[in-house]
């Protein structure tokens, strides 16, 4: 069952969507307690105007899920920075249609709101124990009344400022045994005992105390708490999903003016055009992992016939749009996987630039890229390849670990928004090297656009010069030359540990003994 998730600032939520949210809430939130003074046992309803009030603050955010063009779940949150402390991510409302519960819709919405590990606090007010367990799982911390009590006054002030159903007179009771707030919202608790039984185990007891009708738990976790360690199952899931996570991350790179490394398309195209045996109007070019097509478009502009391949449809769409705008009939793009695509023809020159090789932590997958590159080369044709420089990465590194023996150290790595915003993934504050495998780990935050916010663990492979030369030879390439370079200055060979030497550039020729001959 496919769901589409989106994310909007509160001020940008259209009235039509608010109407749908009101209908969903009024039909799905629950029923008033039989002891309620008004409408006992009746469905709890909420007018659009009340939802608008929750969306008024500048810090309000909406995460919602669509299925078959209908909204089936949403979460409203406040994300605001408290001076001297940091961001608080507070979910103020969560509703999921009963037909879509137990299908990870609510979990996906909540995890998106609580995903950023560098926030000061995360939480919600709720009478649902499952929501509290979701908070604990998302933030890798336990809800502990004793810890909440240390900051409950700060949280109260935050709520009075941002949450319309909390005011100066709202009663909040927090002690070592419980944390709760009287929201005077008497929803029926008939299913609460069985829910509490379901979430309580000897190893993970319920710590938040009992709950009376009209009250909700005041549930929060905090940055300075001890983290729940990575389980073997979580590590296996992380490794197995690494390729898909990386694909998501690349799709969310803004590739705008702040990505300075991507602004050298024209000068790099001139370098390519000057390579031995390469000439516009004669040389056919394949650009594997073309991204938004900056090299393909610049080469097309000076007369080359170019085909660009990338597995990200959103980047290919951007490339096609630029090519069409420039009327470049000699440039085409296709959304396909560089490891598998077979274009049914061979080229005079194949490009594979800016770390397409190295995208995968599993070296076997990178070898598939090189093998397919060779497959698409004419006999004696040439290739230009670049990968990230492991020696510079190691020289700069401040953080290292072993996933095999100390995986929890990865939890302490600081996240950054570099991949989305600048593309600078050589900042040593934000990467960690596995000493056993030399795989590089980063936590990357993505928040631009309408997709749900995400903090992803990204893995990549970087190379020493002799290693990537050896991989090229094994694939069926003769290495004509290789050098350490920086973006836009490929004609200038650098030392292996020079601060600018982030890339290794290789000019290769298809070997006569290539296995693809």
What do the predicted segments below correspond to?
Residues 25-92:
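A conserved beta-strand-loop-helix scaffold within acyl/acetyltransferase catalytic domains
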């Amino acid at each position: 069952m496919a769901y589409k998730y989106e994310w909007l600032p509160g001020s940008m939520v259209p009235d039509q969507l608010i109407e749908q949210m009101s209908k969903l809430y009024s039909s799905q939130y629950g029923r008033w307690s039989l002891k309620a003074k008004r409408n006992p046992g009746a469905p709890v309803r909420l007018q659009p105007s009340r939802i608008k009030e929750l969306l008024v603050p500048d810090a309000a955010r909406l995460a919602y899920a669509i299925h078959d063009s209908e909204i089936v779940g949403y979460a409203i949150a406040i994300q605001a920075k408290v001076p001297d402390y940091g961001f608080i991510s507070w979910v103020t409302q969560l509703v999921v249609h009963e037909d879509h519960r137990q299908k990870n819709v609510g979990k996906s919405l909540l995890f998106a709101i609580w995903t950023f590990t560098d926030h000061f606090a995360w939480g919600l007010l709720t009478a649902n124990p499952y929501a509290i367990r979701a908070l604990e799982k998302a933030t890798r911390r336990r809800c502990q009344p004793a810890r909440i009590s240390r900051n409950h006054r700060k949280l109260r002030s935050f709520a009075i400022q941002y949450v319309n159903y909390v005011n100066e007179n709202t009663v909040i009771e927090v002690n070592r045994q419980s944390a709760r707030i009287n929201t005077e919202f008497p929803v029926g608790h008939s299913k609460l005992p069985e829910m509490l039984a379901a979430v309580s185990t000897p190893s993970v007891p319920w710590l938040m105390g009992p709950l009376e009708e009209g009250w909700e738990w005041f549930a929060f976790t905090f940055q300075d708490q001890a983290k729940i360690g990575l389980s073997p199952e979580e590590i296996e899931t992380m490794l197995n999903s690494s390729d898909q996570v990386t694909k998501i991350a690349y799709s969310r790179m803004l590739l705008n003016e702040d990505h300075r490394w991507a602004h050298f398309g024209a000068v790099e195209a001139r370098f390519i055009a000057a390579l031995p045996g390469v000439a516009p109007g004669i040389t056919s070019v394949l650009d594997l992992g073309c991204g938004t097509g900056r090299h393909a478009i610049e080469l097309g502009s000076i007369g080359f016939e170019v085909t660009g391949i990338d597995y990200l449809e959103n980047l290919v769409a951007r490339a096609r749009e630029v090519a069409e705008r420039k009327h470049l009939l000699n440039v085409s793009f296709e959304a396909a996987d560089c490891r598998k695509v077979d274009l049914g023809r061979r080229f005079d020159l194949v490009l594979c630039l800016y770390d397409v090789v190295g995208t995968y932590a599993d070296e076997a997958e990178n070898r598939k890229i090189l093998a397919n590159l060779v497959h698409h080369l004419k006999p004696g044709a040439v290739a230009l390849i670049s990968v990230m420089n492991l020696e510079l990465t190691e020289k700069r590194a401040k953080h290292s670990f072993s996933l095999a023996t100390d995986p929890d150290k990865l939890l302490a790595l600081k996240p950054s928004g570099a991949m989305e915003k600048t593309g600078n993934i050589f900042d040593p504050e934000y990467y960690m090297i596995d000493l056993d495998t030399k795989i590089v780990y980063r936590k990357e935050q993505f928040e631009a656009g309408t997709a749900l916010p995400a903090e992803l663990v990204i893995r990549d492979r970087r190379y020493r010069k002799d290693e990537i030369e050896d991989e090229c030879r094994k694939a069926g390439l003769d290495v004509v030359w290789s050098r350490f370079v920086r973006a836009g200055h490929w004609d200038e060979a650098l030392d292996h540990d020079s601060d600018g030497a982030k890339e290794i550039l290789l000019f290769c020729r298809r070997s006569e003994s290539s296995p693809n001959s």
